[in-house]
Regions:
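Short, mixed-charge aromatic SLiMs
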Residues: 210, 261-271, 305-317
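Charged, amphipathic alpha-helical linkers/stalks
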Residues: 290-363
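Gram-negative bacterial Sec-dependent N-terminal signal peptides
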Residues: 1-19
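Hydrophobic alpha-helical bundle signature of multipass membrane enzymes
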Residues: 21-268, 331-423
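Alpha-helical transmembrane segments that form the membrane-embedded catalytic/substrate-binding core
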Residues: 233-237, 267-297, 304
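Residues in and immediately flanking transmembrane alpha helices
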Residues: 15-16, 246, 289
Length: 423
């Protein structure tokens, strides 16, 4: 084992940045659609339908019918989330401090060149306009499921995904459900600070607001209020996906891609720009790393993780490692091409500014985001992976500080992939 780790360390030191290939927008859209119920797998489609049915049931609650009025008032119930356990811990999430850190991290948004602003609008317009029906329906389900964890089930594969859905509604994942949702740092203050109008409010826009024929099924166009930058839904998607990936590292790559796909859904609906999504990815990654480095949070995380893993193994009737496996046909999130999709969502092909290429500096503790997925590597090796798989400098939110550079350029999917190849 020591020899294997030494070889990996040498390879990382010698390696040039290794990036997933850039793909055009139409290819990214096709990959986004490949993980919808349009996938050519009955097992996967059944999982998607079960997740949607459970979401609609949760949203309806004890009401006679599911109406739009209920959407703003729904959240995980006391069975699903053990909020009493979390409250009793007395843990302080330091929400305001983390919100201010997020605003500082995204400050480059205020000085974007006009070319980037125009391309930002052009890209959301194209994605929204050309999205196929199955992609739009997935986006609607993602949007209305923000208060729950159902959306993560499809990235677990058919067998583990179904076990997750069952255990979640039975309350067997209560600690994880409570902790994950409480770890979402609201983007509300950042939205007020940057005060950027949504794409469908820009004068002369051609955004198509998508009628809801999936969740409430009232054919009302999906819309959103408040500022556009950064995306609150994307912050939720990435936060939830990254924390579950740390709890179930057997599905790490698929869950990272699920976070990216959740953000893509916001653009499909025409309610967010690419930079809204990119900014929220940066903030969510920063926040999750912050929490996982806090020893007091780690105590809660470990307790929640252990409960979740035991419950899922019991529901599966086998080890979690075995339950997480599935054949490629039934598991589109494990298609290697999804790493190309994740790479696309890091930039959405927005213009890269020419200029110096500063050496990437990894913030202290950021490597914790790979710790659970790559426990055989040292902290130094995980930091080297992050450096050697990072995007080039110069993308719109890279900013001027080392921390802005890092979180814009961090490619977790590529770092994980390189580790698999070098091990």
């Amino acid at each position: 084992m020591k020899r294997q780790l030494s070889l990996l360390a040498v390879a990382l030191l010698l390696a040039q940045p290794v990036l997933a290939k850039d793909i055009p927008l139409n290819r990214a859209a096709a990959l986004a659609n490949s993980v919808t119920p349009a996938a050519s797998s009955q097992a996967y489609d059944d999982l998607e339908q079960q997740a949607l049915a459970q979401l609609r049931h949760a949203l309806q609650g004890d009401a006679a019918t599911l109406t739009r009025d209920r959407l703003a008032h729904t959240k995980q119930n006391q069975t699903q989330a053990d909020t009493a356990w979390l409250k009793a811990s007395g843990y302080d999430f330091q929400t305001r401090a983390n919100q201010q850190a997020g605003i500082a991290l995204l400050s480059a948004f205020s000085t974007l060149p006009e070319t980037v602003v125009k391309q930002n609008l052009a890209t959301v317009t194209a994605i929204n306009r050309d999205a196929v029906q199955t992609t739009r329906r997935q986006a609607l389900a993602d949007a209305e499921g923000i208060s729950y964890l159902y959306f993560l089930s499809d990235a677990l594969g058919p067998r583990l995904g179904k076990a997750f859905l069952t255990a979640y509604d039975q309350g067997a994942l209560g600690k994880a459900a409570a902790l994950i949702k409480a770890s979402e740092v609201s983007t509300g203050e950042a939205k007020k600070h940057f005060n950027n109008p949504r794409p469908f409010l820009v004068q002369g826009n051609t955004i198509h607001l998508v009628p809801d024929d999936v969740v409430v099924k009232d054919n009302q166009p999906y819309t959103a209020d408040g500022g556009s930058f950064p995306s609150g839904h994307t912050n939720t998607g990435y936060t939830d996906a990254l924390l579950l990936a740390a709890m179930i590292p057997e599905r790490y790559d698929a869950l990272v891609a699920r976070g990216a796909r959740y953000g893509f859904s916001r653009i499909v609906l025409g309610v967010h720009y690419p930079l809204d999504v990119i900014g929220s990815r940066m903030v969510a990654e920063r926040n999750v790393a912050h929490y996982l480095n806090d020893p007091h949070y780690r105590v809660l995380f470990n307790e929640a993780r252990d409960q979740l893993r035991a419950a899922l193994a019991k529901a599966c009737g086998t080890s979690l490692a075995e339950c997480a496996k599935s054949n490629v046909k039934d598991d589109p999130w494990r298609d290697p091409a999804m790493r190309d999709f994740s790479r696309f969502t890091m930039t959405y092909d927005l213009p890269q500014q020419k200029g110096p290429q500063p050496r990437l500096q990894v913030p202290e503790g950021a490597e914790v985001l790979l710790e659970d997925a790559l426990p055989h590597l040292s902290a130094a090796q995980r930091r080297a992976l992050m450096v050697n798989t990072a995007l080039p400098a110069g993308y719109p939110l890279s900013g001027a500080t080392p921390e802005q550079q890092f979180w814009q350029r961090l490619n977790l999917s590529a770092a994980w992939e390189m580790a698999q190849k070098r091990h």
